Amino acid sequence: VKSPRFGLNRFDSRSVDAFAADVRRAEQLDWDAALQPDSQLRRRDTYVLLAAAARATERITLGPLLANPVNRHPTVTASSIATIDELAPGRVLLGWGVGDTAVRLAGLKPARVGELEAGTRLMRALLAGESVEVGAARPARLPHHRPVPVWIAAGGPKTLRMAGGVADGVFIRVGTHPANIATAVSAIRAGAVEAGRDPAAVKLAAIFHTVLVDEPARALTMARSMAAGYYEYSPALFDPPALPWTGPDPETLKHDRNIWPDFHHAPDLEASGKAVDFLPVEAADAFSLRGGTGEVAERLLGALRAAPAAFDYVVLHPIPDPKWPSDPDNDYTARIAREVLPQVRKELEKT
């Protein structure tokens, strides 16, 4: 099994300088990618942060994960990411999707699959230096175009299939269960074939919510909240692993238990996890890695070995959200880098 490049998507964003320093620390700890959410009502401007990180680093891959075509027009995003690539040549990617929390918090609706597809085609053309008809007096062109790959983050079958047909790569966001991952990879490959593309040319990545909590009961509770978050937006993901949902509708639970904005982003993940204590352990383990570093490493290896294809990137999304300032020697960034990644890389080299 090929070892993927490991990415992190949570950094100290209390200031621009703090973000740049934290990404530099991640690079020194041998993380491969630093990816930043584009959520304007929760965090500082993504591209200002990435520009600062580009100046402070030499090797690590940088990019948004994820942007969307609702909060920023695709031409704006293409211009911004091309500018970042000027600062970090050849180590930038653009990760985007329909938009969930960032869009909903602004009172807007996530993009439709067709809108995301059109935006992807537009951005890839602009970043390749092509002229594109956009309904203006003249075709649009990006003077400072750069060859930045456009990745789509997706979990639903329609979006995955579309992504296989138009994107440079796909961040699969369906949890850790092999049945869901296999279903996602099949959809991506089918979309590539339909579009006349070589399926092997579409790069693959995975996003794994990683509950790094040493106390087993707390880790399980938070993992249940992660499972509920997936069900909340994509209930069909419970079908391939044949998992039950025997509780009330997620929206009813959120209202009755004061869970906001959703099960993935609730400030108190133990409280939100207890609200779905009817979920079996199998559901918790189908949508996240959990436990101490030893357990996380074992579960991560299992997920990678069971996957039907090799991943170029694996993003280990920290749960719960790190608190800043943190202990730089013992926080999530350091513990995963020191106690998980070397072991996983070594084991994968053997196979």
What do the predicted segments below correspond to?
Residues P4-D17, A67-P74, H145-G155, T210-V213, ...:
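Active-site mouth loops of central-metabolism enzymes
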Residues A33-A56, N68, D100-V103, V174-P178, ...:
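Glycine-rich, proline-tolerant flexible connector loops at the mouths of alpha/beta enzymes
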Residues Y47-A67, N71, L126, A334-E349:
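Alpha-helix-loop-beta-strand connector modules within alpha/beta enzyme cores
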Residues P4-R10, A34-Q36, T61-L65, V92-W96, ...:
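Hydrophobic faces of well-ordered beta-strands that scaffold small-molecule active sites
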Residues D30, A53, I84, M123, ...:
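Conserved, mostly hydrophobic/aromatic
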Residues R14-A26, T77-S80, A154-M162, T293-R305:
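Short, acidic/polar
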Residues V1-L65, V148:
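N-terminal beta1-alpha1-beta2 module of alpha/beta enzyme domains
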Residues K109-R141, I181-A309, E347-T351:
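An alpha-helical appendage that flanks or caps ligand/catalytic pockets
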